[in-house]
Amino acid sequence: MEGSDFVDPAFSSGERISASDLNSEHIIQAENHSFANRISMDMDVPDGHQLDSNLTGFRWKRVLNPTGPQPRPRHGHRAINIKELMVVFGGGNEGIVDELHVYNTVTNQWYVPVLKGDVPNGCAAYGFVVEGTRMFVFGGMIEYGKYSNELYELQATKWEWRKMYPESPDSGLSPCPRLGHSFTMVGEKIFLFGGLANESDDPKNNIPKYLNDLYILDTRGVHSHNGKWIVPKTYGDSPPPRESHTGISFATKSNGNLNLLIYGGMSGCRLGDLWLLETDSMTWSKPKTSGEAPLPRSLHSSTMIGNKMYVFGGWVPLVINDSKSTTEREWKCTNTLAVLDLETMTWENVTLDTVEENVPRARAGHCAVGIQSRLYVWSGRDGYRKAWNNQVCCKDLWYLEVSKPLYAVKVALVRASTHALELSWTATTFAAAYVLQIQKIEQPLNTSSKLLSNNIVQQGTPTSAETSGINISANRSGSALGLGVEATSTVLKLEKESLQLSGCQPETNVQPSVNDLLQSMSQPSSPASRADKDPLSSGGGTTFNLSTSVASVHPQISVISSTAAVTGNDTASPSGAINSILQKFRPVVTAVRTSTTTAVSIATSTSDPLSVRVPSTMSANVVLSSSSSTLRIVPSVTASHSLRIASSQASGNNCRSSSAINILKTALPNVAVQSQPTSSTTTSIGGKQYFIQKPLTLAPNVQLQFVKTSGGMTVQTLPKVNFTASKGTPPHGISIANPHLASGITQIQGSTVPGSQIQKPIVSGNVLKLVSPHTMAGGKLIMKNSNILQMGKVTPNVMGGKPAFVITNKQGTPLGNQQIIIVTTGGNVRSVPTSTVMTSAGGSASGTNIVSIVNSTSTTPSPLQALSGQKTLISNQSGVKMLRNISSVQASSSMAFGQKQSGTPIHQKTALYIGGKAVTVMSTNTSMAASGNKVMVLPGTSSNNSPATTTALSARKSFVFNAGGSPRTVTLATKSINAKSIPQSQPVTETNNHSVATIKDTDPMDDIIEQLDGAGDLLKLSESEGQHGSEENENNGENATSSSASALFTGGDTAGPSRAQNPIVMEHPVDIIEDVSGVSSTTDVNETAIVSGDTIESLKMSEKENDDVKSMGEKSILSDDCHQPTTSETEAATILTTIKSAEALVLETAEIRKDHTGCTIGSLKENQDENKKFKQRQESSPSQNIHQFQNVDGSQLEALASAALLQAATSDTTALALKELIERPESETNTRSSNIAEIQQNNVQSTLAVVVPNTSQNENQKWHTVGVFKDLSHTVTSYIDSNCISDSFFDGIDVDNLPDFSKFPRTNLEPGTAYRFRLSAINSCGRGEWGEISSFKTCLPGFPGAPSAIKISKDVKEGAHLTWEPPPAQKTKEIIEYSVYLAVKPTAKDKALSTPQLAFVRVYVGAANQCTVPNASLSNAHVDCSNKPAIIFRIAARNQKGYGPATQVRWLQDPAAAKQHTPTVTPNLKRGPEKSTIGSSNIANTFCSPHKRGRNGLHD
């Protein structure tokens, strides 16, 4: 019979079978349509059959010693792949079988699943495709001469067969029974082409008929159950009839069109032609190819990997003779490999190893699948060994590496120590070795203060060596950025003892960069016109930096004026005018530094909330914020002594506030004095008298001059001061304004509460009070201070340990609902004061007031002098913790206020134990419950000046957190609040925009307290409407300790760092700031990134300062698109290493509204286009200071994604400049962006750069090599400098020629230093792409390590029982306690967001290294279903210095339980490596893949 390939008694009882019966080849469709798994190959077309130099990595390898029940050798079978599984069905040798075997290419294991349902008869030479987990089998030979046209579906999730009955086509008949056809998945449909039919009714009398018909099988939509056959109308010449050919599908790269490619087969003789069906137009064509085509063949395999088709084996003609082409009857099997580049249609015939033992034997009728970078071939007929009575089949399994490995996963931190980092990583599929590289994150010297002093305000004019320096600059930044990374030393190095009064005159440029970034913009023709055309233009606000040093007798004071942006309807201040910037004036102010106080006369307009921050290393940090007449106390974010006023505008899409915020910070108790008009007013500040000389008769708006009367010193004038008289009330505000800008006047109106007296027991701590003087007629007082913000000393005595405070409000105006909780933080149980008083004075209260007093050891009542009969208490004691977080929320006019309160006591609501310590929550009076904020303050445990974050509240419940050893505050805002203000004195605020997934609106206060401990553990960035960008902030080091809280925002519009706008300007995928403490790297920055060089402001804090800084209040920040942990049942926990918040600053950036996207640095739209490209990049350009986030568009398969910002440590100048640039209108951005580079030059330690993708790497960003490892873990103690081994060194290596690194010198790791790591996999083809970057930090001595060997057992009655091994013994510190955190479900509102959010709750704190989490808590646990259902725990240990790194562990659950939980978003990931993300505030956030082998005793 013509066309007989062989005589094979294999499939029936010794009967002869024509070649056409079984001369059919399996089709691998699974890979054909799976574009996500395609791998790019960098190959050149070889000359002839010679192996090109780029293809030298092609080496066959035989799989040795697989485990499990191996299938019997066979041919005529087919195989598809589902992920890393190869599924083999049918075929046979001594009879056709219905066996199904599965081979796991990762574990090298065969297994036989238990099948159920309508198991089909054994068949051979059938069609086999896969769509997701649905496999379809069509046709084939059932027995000799009997073919099938039945269709079966196999569901891989249940291994259940189902027979399908597809509908017939609308015109024509269903496909006839056949074998040797191609069955190819093209897009969402299955294409059936050709095959061999039997025209005889008698199976024994076989009459072969070659087919070339084309059918489409639709298995989607309404046809998903049974399917439907479609006979498409095609154009062009169809391929000739054939069988035993192959079909693959691919997409044209240029236009994305899907194509069906038919190759080879048999039709009486071997065929070697190619036919292309363009499925959009259904047009057949015969593509032209270049290169030397392989021999014609049938029963071969064609497999798509990447953009290439790999043809292996099959029957080929024995002799090529054109005259016998139609009658050729001699053939042979081959083991050659041919490669067709589908983009260029070029054949790349490859010559492989000729040693017989190193290559598969020649075969036909085998099966082949492509799994990632490998081509697997199994069994088939042995072409060299055939007999008349028996076919010999191969029983070997081979694979061929055809491309370099996929990009490696992110490295995980197992354990951190002072001089070593133990890392681990998940195996990259088919990688044989790994290259690990390291990059040190340079930590600038502690000279940021000097930078500021020199760069911002260096044009001072010395006037006296006995006075403090005052530097004044104008700035248009709308953000309240604290300037400077503050360490134990002063922010501004106090090198000059002379007074410096510098200003930016209109005609003078201090420096190009400083002038552009810090100097005010050109004055608008009118404030109104400016606001109309520039919604981002700023209202009036003044920024003062007053920095004092305990060690310095002549501290330098830096005053910076900035405008606060006013957006939308908020362009007008309450007075009807826009508060313009205080530009270019040279005030004459003498701040005399004494050992007791430093005083500054400050006045701002009523529309500008004023925050006074009083930090001190010896005492607690306090900030008093005044919004109109309301007070706000916010903690200091600095570890040094500085007085600052920063201006910011709280405005956003859903947040409206017409006032800016001024923050005044000072290191010592300060007095903010406001004088009322009298014939003469004197103020004693720091032992010096200041006289205000003015006319005896004062009319409203009298302009005054301050005269400094120090002996021997010249008198200099200050900008004129306006006194605005108020009817009915004596208080008047002193306004410091530019004499040329009437709209720039800001003022504070004092309040007067006649006859009120407050005298309560008070703690020996710092108490901030507002003192209102009594009323005098006729201006006869020589000295009147209408508002005194005073910190004084209180001598301890036995008055009962009750702290007291006073909030004075404008008279006649009800206070907004205020809840004040005061918690003392002694070593024992905390006591809560019952005598807290809020007084309302005059004016209008539109915000919330929060005062908390903690950490007292002794108390005393200390009455002051009576002013108008009102007695107030002041106290100040070094070493005592003070007021914590406050949130000033600007309320709308429709906000419901509580009744007018004057001296309203706060009533206790409930007492709880938090962190093992008693805490009492105070609830407001019922009359005040109509609106306002509830504030909860948790006790701190040490006196530490660590960064704190003051955040505005959205209308939803929010956490306000302090980042150091300070009490935690949780503030819940009512729905009526539509304005938010976030005065942030420096870039240390990290989580202004993170949504809370743990708090429901109806949560009782005690529930909130429970979640407060974990509040800071994991923060999700909330993307609000109109938010053009999303910033993922990694908390600096210790933003949440066990005794400090983290701020979680759940509002739709979250408050930006200094505005109520969203925090970052970039489009959502862009996460731009990189911070050392934001440990884990992020990759794929998709837009122009604004970066402050890879520098970390290393602030050396004393042990005392760091007591509470190390803590477990960790936050995992979820990227909007990334939230799913890595795969694998034995995923071990990610270990987080600690980075102190004081050692790294996060640059706060305000987001520009959508209509101002052009205001970003660089062109935002251009970079949005770049996003798509960079999302596909796993590797961040080493030169970029920002690491690009992988899958920022939501394309992750993990539940906790790479959310941590690589936070960029920036100097204050950089932060301010960047902030200003971001918020500046586009027209101004272009003119100013060019000057950013100049700041880079000026700020040596902290550079600001506009990062454009693919920038060249600088010297500090070179990667150094740790080594090449075949294991999946390594303890890094040293590395080889890049000068010895560069990146190009690894370009030519593969697994067979690994270098020897022992000859190179190595550099040891340093303690307390942050490093970046990246990993690359190596196989026989070479080195793959670099994976995502992770950042970890070596420990500082004295802190505990991470718990290990975590074991979790389940008790049906009690819950989950956790045990763990303590960290390695500390030399000097003992473990005091452990904290265990549990990931909890998101709230309903959070679920409604674009991306689910995750939060942690502390479920245990105690000294024992074991705990039981009750079922009640587990019922609220978040079940991560990204891979295998798991509950996530975190455990950290604490010693006397603080909390060490945490260990995260995933506890696998029953998959059935996962169905009851909403799975997290699982978008497509670039080639699929998975990783888990864990973050903490003081613990270096790490994001890594699970440890598949459960190393280090960590259990999944």
From Swiss-Prot:
Keywords on record: Autocatalytic cleavage, Cell cycle, Kelch repeat, Nucleus, Phosphoprotein, Repeat
First-listed, main subcellular location of the protein, grouped into a coarse class: nucleus
Ranges of compositional bias, category Basic and acidic residues: 1166-1178
Thermal characteristics: Optimum temperature is 20 degrees Celsius for complex formation activity of the N-terminus and 33.5 degrees Celsius for nuclear localization of the protein in vitro.
Motif (Bipartite nuclear localization signal): 1470-1495
PTM statement from Swiss-Prot or TrEMBL: Proteolytic cleavage occurs between amino acids 900 and 1100 within the non-conserved central region, giving rise to two independent but tightly associated N- and C-terminal subunits.
UniProt keyword tRNA processing present: no
Example GO BP: positive regulation of DNA-templated transcription
Composition skew (Low complexity), residue ranges: 1036-1047
Gene3D superfamilies: 6.10.250.2590, Immunoglobulins, Kelch-type beta propeller
SUPFAM superfamilies cross-referenced by the UniProt entry: Fibronectin type III, Kelch motif
Any one Gene Ontology cellular component term annotated for this protein: Set1C/COMPASS complex
Biased composition (Basic residues): 1490-1500
Residues that bear Phosphoserine: 477, 958, 966, 1489
Composition bias type Polar residues, residue spans: 517-528, 1477-1488
Highest taxon of source: Eukaryota
Residue stretches of each Kelch repeat: 85-133, 135-181, 189-237, 259-307, 308-373
Additional information: Due to lack of HCF repeats, the cleavage process occurs via a different mechanism to that in the mammalian HCFC1.
Record text on subunit structure and interactions: Core component of several methyltransferase-containing complexes. Component of the SET1 complex, composed at least of the catalytic subunit Set1, wds/WDR5, Wdr82, Rbbp5, ash2, Cfp1/CXXC1, hcf and Dpy-30L1. Component of the MLL3/4 complex composed at least of the catalytic subunit trr, ash2, Rbbp5, Dpy-30L1, wds, hcf, ptip, Pa1, Utx, Lpt and Ncoa6. Component of the Ada2a-containing (ATAC) complex composed of at least Ada2a, Atac1, Hcf, Ada3, Gcn5, Mocs2B, Charac-14, Atac3, Atac2, NC2beta and wds.
Name of this protein: Host cell factor
Source organism of this protein record: Drosophila melanogaster (Fruit fly)
Taxonomic classification: Eukaryota, Metazoa, Ecdysozoa, Arthropoda, Hexapoda
